[in-house]
């Protein structure tokens, strides 16, 4: 009986070859999966350039889980080294370079956020690697060897670089290193498959070239669509405000997903759920509610999904996040650590301070890392959501 690869086909934009490859398409990947005598090593890398992962990032993670469930090894690379350069893909100017401390703090939250997606428990199904393991050890000779595998012309063919060069916007030499470093990650972990968004085709192709250079069999590149945000217009992005964060309160998730435009619903179901597309309700409003329910259930469980649904149906526009009145604060300015104790999110100011230092406190989804954070006036906090860990929230109100 032929193996069912419907999980592989769902939501894929492209399984790509280099021009010289005759069989690097989805059928040859299926053949490799069906005949391999060992688990394939399936790579996905994410740079901790911010504290949050949103639903757009979950798409390759979900495909990675599909490979795990088929018996293969997911290699999740936390790009703690490459994050300090920043991927120039799609950028019209150089990214701000992060400090080592920025990256370390951001990386702390990533594994907790993806735990509901990936299989962390089955032996041999997951490796978590930090690319500083190998990239920080590259000497000048090895870096020169990597640089010698590509030409300036090849780099300028990359869409973001080409646009900037045409507009005479600066391109800094260290930015040319990013595709080579991402590619070298594939060499270091001996990847058989690399997952990425459609905007990552160039970088994944560089990985294939470097694997050939170092005598390895080149990886398959599996490209996945870029998720359009909740506005139905631009790609999901925190900076555009059209995102749903994995760390958000269940009620907030539910409310946002109920508002996904009708024309985007099928894409959301295909990329973010396992529900059969041909079994979806015909009514767009029913589809929106089903989408919200299904995704909240994935990340928070059925009870949380039911509570979020009931809150939305009863007119709870803020997703039933408990409220704390700032009138109960004796005086301002006030320290955030004190507020954590006063709201009951922590047992005391001291515990609040420790939670901040551990990276477990967020305000409107943004992690707060300074234990001495002070707010001067109540207006600074009106309507904002204070969070400790994954499941403790309050909305601050006047």
UniProtKB/Swiss-Prot annotation:
Keyword Cytoplasm in record: yes
Species the sequence originates in: Trichormus variabilis (strain ATCC 29413 / PCC 7937)
Reaction(s) the record says it catalyses: tRNA(Tyr) + L-tyrosine + ATP = L-tyrosyl-tRNA(Tyr) + AMP + diphosphate + H(+)
HAMAP family documented for this protein: Tyr_tRNA_synth_type2
Residues annotated for ATP binding in this entry: 238
Name of the protein in question: Tyrosine--tRNA ligase
Top enzyme class: ligase
InterPro entries: aa-tRNA-synth_I_CS, aa-tRNA-synth_Ic, Rossmann-like_a/b/a_fold, S4_RNA-bd_sf, SYY-like_C, Tyr-tRNA-ligase, Tyr-tRNA-ligase_bac-type, Tyr-tRNA-ligase_bac_2
Domain spans labelled S4 RNA-binding: 334-398
Molecular function as annotated in GO: ATP binding; RNA binding; tyrosine-tRNA ligase activity
Biological role: Catalyzes the attachment of tyrosine to tRNA(Tyr) in a two-step reaction: tyrosine is first activated by ATP to form Tyr-AMP and then transferred to the acceptor end of tRNA(Tyr).
């Amino acid at each position: 009986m032929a193996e069912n690869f419907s999980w592989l086909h769902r939501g894929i934009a492209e399984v790509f070859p280099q021009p010289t490859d005759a069989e690097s398409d989805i059928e040859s990947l299926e053949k490799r999966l069906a005949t391999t005598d060992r688990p394939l090593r399936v790579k996905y890398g994410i740079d901790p350039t911010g504290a949050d992962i949103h639903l757009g990032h979950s798409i390759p993670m979900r495909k990675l889980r599909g490979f795990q469930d088929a018996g293969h090894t997911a290699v999740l690379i936390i790009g703690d080294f490459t994050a300090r350069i920043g991927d120039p893909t799609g950028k019209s100017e150089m990214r701000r370079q992060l400090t080592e401390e920025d990256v370390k703090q951001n990386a702390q939250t990533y594994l907790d956020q993806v735990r509901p997606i990936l299989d962390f428990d089955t032996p041999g199904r997951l490796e978590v690697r930090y690319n500083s393991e190998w990239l920080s050890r590259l000497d000048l000779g090895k870096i020169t060897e990597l640089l010698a595998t590509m030409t300036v012309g090849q780099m300028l063919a990359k869409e973001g670089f080409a646009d900037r060069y045409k507009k005479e916007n600066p391109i800094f030499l260290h930015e040319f290193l990013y595709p080579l470093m991402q590619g070298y990650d594939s060499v270091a972990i001996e990847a058989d498959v690399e997952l990425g968004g459609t905007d990552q085709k160039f970088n994944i192709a560089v990985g294939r070239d470097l694997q050939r250079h170092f005598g390895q069999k080149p990886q398959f590149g599996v490209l996945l669509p870029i998720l359009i945000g909740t506005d139905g217009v631009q790609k999901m992005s925190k900076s555009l405000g059209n995102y749903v964060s994995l760390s958000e309160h269940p009620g907030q998730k539910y409310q946002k997903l109920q508002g996904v435009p009708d024309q985007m619903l099928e894409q959301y179901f295909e990329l973010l759920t396992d529900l059969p597309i041909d079994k979806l309700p015909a009514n767009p409003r029913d589809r929106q509610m089903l989408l919200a329910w299904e995704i909240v259930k994935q990340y928070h469980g059925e009870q949380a999904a039911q509570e979020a649904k009931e809150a939305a149906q009863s007119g709870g526009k803020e997703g039933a996040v408990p409220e704390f009145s700032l009138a109960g604060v004796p005086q301002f300015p006030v320290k955030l650590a004190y507020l954590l104790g006063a709201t009951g999110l922590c047992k005391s100011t001291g515990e609040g301070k420790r939670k901040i230092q551990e990276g477990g406190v967020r305000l409107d989804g943004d992690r707060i890392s300074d234990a001495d954070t002070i707010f001067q006036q109540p207006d600074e906090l009106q309507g904002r959501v204070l969070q400790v860990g994954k499941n403790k929230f309050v909305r601050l109100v006047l």
